[in-house]
């Protein structure tokens, strides 16, 4: 093995393939853009975003780690969300959960 050497897998790698998924329509009713990162608890996003927050509880965007989705003022778009894995505990963000989902 050479330091930094990569051993890529054959075929396609599917992100979040075994996780529960939902699609929501989200509208930015605010006057400023809102950007949401890949692992942010979607139910706790900026209040200017209008969508079914209860359906989004325990979910995050189904996008690659380290990326984000930007909602421009007045924009409406569909997003796909996936459930959190692991211990399914949420801390921080807007402090609405602070524990088990």
Curated annotation (Swiss-Prot):
Q: Where in the cell is it found?
A: Cytoplasm
* Known pathway: Nitrogen metabolism; urea degradation; CO(2) and NH(3) from urea (urease route): step 1/1
| Entries under Pfam families matching the protein | Urease_beta
List, alphabetically, the InterPro entries matched.
Answer: Urease_beta-like (IPR002019), Urease_betasu_sf (IPR036461), Urease_subunit (IPR050069)
E.C. designation(s): 3.5.1.5
**UniProtKB keywords:** Cytoplasm, Hydrolase
* Listed GO CC annotations: urease complex
Entry superkingdom: Bacteria
Its recorded reaction(s) are: urea + 2 H2O + H(+) = hydrogencarbonate + 2 NH4(+)
> What's a Gene Ontology MF term here?
urease activity
User: One GO biological process from the UniProt record?
Assistant: urea catabolic process
Q: Which NCBIfam families match?
A: PRK13203.1 (NF009682), urease_beta (TIGR00192)
Q: What's this protein's family per the entry?
A: Belongs to the urease beta subunit family.
Oligomer and partners? Heterotrimer of UreA (gamma), UreB (beta) and UreC (alpha) subunits. Three heterotrimers associate to form the active enzyme.
Instruction: Please state what the protein is called.
Output: Urease subunit beta
Q: Which organism is it from?
A: Cereibacter sphaeroides (strain ATCC 17023 / DSM 158 / JCM 6121 / CCUG 31486 / LMG 2827 / NBRC 12203 / NCIMB 8253 / ATH 2.4.1.) (Rhodobacter sphaeroides)
Q: Which gene encodes it?
A: ureB
């Amino acid at each position: 093995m050479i330091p930094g050497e990569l051993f890529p897998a054959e075929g396609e790698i599917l992100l979040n393939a075994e996780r529960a998924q939902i699609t929501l329509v989200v509208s930015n009713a605010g006057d400023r853009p809102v950007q949401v990162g890949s692992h942010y608890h979607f139910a706790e996003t900026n209040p200017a975003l209008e969508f079914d927050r209860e359906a989004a509880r325990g979910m995050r965007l189904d996008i690659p780690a380290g990326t984000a989705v930007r909602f421009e003022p007045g924009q409406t778009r569909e997003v796909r969300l996936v459930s959190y894995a692991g211990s399914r505990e949420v801390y921080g963000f807007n402090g609405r959960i602070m524990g088990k989902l």
